[in-house]
Amino acid sequence: MIKDNFFNNLFIFICDFMIECRNISKGKAEGELIVSSEAISFLGGVDPETGVVIDPNHELKGESIKDKVLFIPGGKGSTVGSYVIFQMMKNNTAPKAIICLKAEPIIATGAIMSDIPMVDSPSSVEELVNGQMVEVDSDNGKITLL
């Protein structure tokens, strides 16, 4: 009985740190979250050579998204943004994974072309804060807080 309660409580504890989401682009990646409340345009908004946000009006201006897990509401701007994401992958300046509140075709296409795991529609967002380490497992539709 004690053993059963222990494992049941452990399961509940672990599940509290998993967030369900929808798979957009296959894969699994782990990294530090960089969070923005603003949509981002990859064309003209992010330098594909460095992975630094260069849009002068964006709250992440000057921040690098290279090797981070990017959490944004969605994307905006030109369809060329998909190719900017692809160029970032080729330059090793892309984010490790992308989480969106609602995916849109530009970023989704870029993530798929670049083999960047991407999910959207997280069941909870309060835990997703700057600096939090997470694992995005889009194959199984979950984000795990580490």
Region locations from a protein language model:
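Short beta-strand-to-coil "C-cap" segments at the C-terminal boundary of structured domains/repeats
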Residues: T144-L146
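Feature captures the catalytic cores and cofactor-binding loops of soluble hydro-lyases/lyases
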Residues: I19-A29, L33-K142
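N-terminal amphipathic/basic-hydrophobic helices that include classical n-h-c signal peptides
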Residues: M1-F17
